[in-house]
């Protein structure tokens, strides 16, 4: 299993390849706000662990294993953002909140959150009911 840091790199590499068709060390460094030398070290580790194939000065490609995990990590991130919107978290806080929790949840918890998102999306009245509960709770605390 990849570490949380490895997951961040795999997720970002997956997104860059999906968006641009390739991922360079400089692109990864910029996206993650880290030094290129840190990216090179992590890419070498990901290569060793068979998440990607890296050739110095030639670039990198995700292996089947890396693509599968990258896809799952992007799904997890997107699902958690969706969940945060449903429960009414301020849009400006969602990204950082998701970044703060995504590595600490089991895949079982992610699957259950997926069930909950689906439950709310099946009927808009459910979301409105939740909003009513939230408004009532806000009034109590004021």
Swiss-Prot record:
The keyword NADP does not apply. It is found in: Cytoplasm. InterPro entries: DtxR_MntR_Metal-Reg, Fe_dep_repressor, Fe_dep_repressor_sf, HTH_DTXR, HTH_tscrpt_reg_MntR, Iron_dep_repressor, WH-like_DNA-bd_sf, WH_DNA-bd_sf. GO terms for cellular component: cytoplasm. Residues 1-63 form the HTH dtxR-type domain. Gene3D superfamilies: Iron dependent repressor, metal binding and dimerisation domain, Winged helix-like DNA-binding domain superfamily/Winged helix DNA-binding domain. PROSITE patterns: HTH_DTXR (PS50944). DNA binding is strongly activated by Mn(2+). Its main location: cytoplasm. Pfam families: Fe_dep_repr_C, Fe_dep_repress. One of its GO terms (molecular function) is manganese ion binding. One of its GO terms (biological process) is intracellular manganese ion homeostasis. Mn(2+) 1 binds at residues 8, 99, 102-103. SMART domains: HTH_DTXR. Belongs to the DtxR/MntR family. Homodimer. Central regulator of manganese homeostasis. This is HTH-type transcriptional regulator MntR. The lineage of its organism: Bacteria, Bacillati, Bacillota, Bacilli, Bacillales.
């Amino acid at each position: 299993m990849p570490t949380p840091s490895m997951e961040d790199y795999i997720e970002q590499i997956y997104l860059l390849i999906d968006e641009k068709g390739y991922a360079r060390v400089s692109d990864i460094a910029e996206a993650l706000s880290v030094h290129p030398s840190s990216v090179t070290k992590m890419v070498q580790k990901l290569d060793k662990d068979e998440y990607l194939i890296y050739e110095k000065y030639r670039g990198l490609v995700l292996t089947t294993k890396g693509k599968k995990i990258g896809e799952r990590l992007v799904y997890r991130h997107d699902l958690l953002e969706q969940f945060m919107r449903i429960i009414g978290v301020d849009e400006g806080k969602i990204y950082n909140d998701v970044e703060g929790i995504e590595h600490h949840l089991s895949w079982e918890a992610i699957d259950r959150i997926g069930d909950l998102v689906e439950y709310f999306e099946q009927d808009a009245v459910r979301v409105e009911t939740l909003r009513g509960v939230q408004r009532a709770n806000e009034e109590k605390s004021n």
